[in-house]
Design a protein with these regions (language model features):
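Domain-level signature for soluble enzymes in the chorismate/prephenate branch of the shikimate pathway
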Residues: 2-151
């Protein structure tokens, strides 16, 4: 998108945050709703006295979240079933997308706090938006009207 391969597109907010994408975020489509959350072993809360070990597929989101809290962290970047990291004592917590929480419960984990709500977003390439503003705005407005009709 950023390199001009497309004028507009749909992407999850998690991807926009993780990649620090240089695009215009035009509209929250309200689809694919979930949340990025910190989760840990049920009933356990990591103490603040040590560097927090965080397993995640989203290292940039996790770093930014804990930077705002002035918390020292050690990122353990994993792909796949990161829910096993706290169980195996590889990490204190995970930062991951949570929709229903079923996978967390199945692994004896629970949400500690929400990092950010996630949903699908309509985005535009900045150059395309500049040169095709009227067409893109018209499309964006029509999509927004249809979304309002659904509510």
């Amino acid at each position: 998108m950023e390199r001009g391969a497309a004028d507009i597109g749909v992407v999850g907010k998690d991807i926009l945050l993780e990649q620090s994408s240089d695009v215009y975020e035009l509209l929250d489509l309200g689809m694919g709703k979930c949340r990025m959350a910190v989760a840990g072993v049920k009933g356990e809360r990591p103490d603040g006295g040590h560097t927090l070990r965080v397993a995640t597929k989203f290292p940039n989101i996790a770093r930014e979240f804990y930077r705002k809290q002035s918390r020292e962290i050690d990122i353990i970047e994993l792909h796949g079933s990161i829910e096993i990291a706290p169980i195996l004592k590889m990490s204190d917590v995970i930062v991951d997308i949570v929709e229903t929480g079923t996978t967390l419960r199945e692994n004896n984990l629970e949400v500690i706090e929400t990092v950010v709500p996630i949903s699908a977003r309509l985005i535009a390439n900045k150059v395309s938006y500049k040169f095709n503003n009227a067409r893109i705005r018209e499309l964006c407005d029509r999509i927004a009207e249809n979304l309002e009709k659904k509510d």
